[in-house]
Design a protein with these regions (language model features):
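C-terminal, non-catalytic macromolecule-binding modules
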Residues: 170-191
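Active-site bordering "gate/hinge" segments
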Residues: 1-164, 169-172
Length: 191
């Protein structure tokens, strides 16, 4: 199975303060899923694997070699899953890698780091700048400047240039994600 998602947004921001900003935002994602099957001791087992990629590119980004890499990754994952065993239960250390685990991080704490929730005092992070909010070694960034990544933009929807924002550094809360309104109300710069 394969899925292709593509969009091409052209954005113009015209603010009341006279700011004019524009951005072109292509976005593509190709996903490949395979199902592998094996019979072991008379028991049929089926497992899935997936591969894919994309970013802020046009459709020409995908070539035959890249497509083959995605298929190979999906096949490898499915075959690896055929050999898997149930995960142990209980409390354990979890290590998140780069990429899609960032969505888990975003949902778990990202919304709580938004300026409006903190200004209103409805976030667990409200009033905690400068305090330890995560384990030592944990750094969380909001970085819209990483070239060609899904979350990368030249300007945000308010016409502000994208930037690299350190939210948590070595476990210490450094700041919040700020739109223009909440930044002004909190006396800080928009992020």
């Amino acid at each position: 199975m394969a899925g292709l998602a593509a969009e091409y947004d052209v954005v113009m921001v015209a603010r009341a303060d006279g700011t004019l900003a524009a951005d072109v935002r292509p976005l593509v994602r190709l996903s490949v899923t395979v199902i592998a099957e094996a019979t072991v001791k008379g028991v049929v087992r089926r497992e899935m694997g997936s591969g894919g990629g994309g970013g802020r590119f046009g459709l020409a980004y995908f070539d035959d070699a890249m497509l083959n890499e995605y298929v190979d990754a999906a096949v490898h994952a499915a075959l690896t899953n055929l050999e898997s065993r149930p995960a142990p239960a209980g409390v354990m250390t979890v290590v998140l890698g780069s990429g899609w685990p960032g969505i888990l991080l975003h949902e778990a704490i990202g919304h709580g780091l938004e300026g409006d929730f903190n200004r209103k005092g409805s976030s667990a992070f409200s009033g905690r700048i400068g305090q330890r909010v995560a384990a030592k070694g944990v750094t969380v960034l909001d970085d819209g400047t990483i070239s060609d990544r899904r979350g990368s933009l030249n300007v945000d929807d308010e016409g502000c240039a994208s930037q690299r924002n350190v939210l948590i550094e070595d476990g210490i809360l450094k700041g919040y994600i700020q739109d223009s309104l909440n930044a002004r109300l909190m006396g800080v710069a928009p992020t």
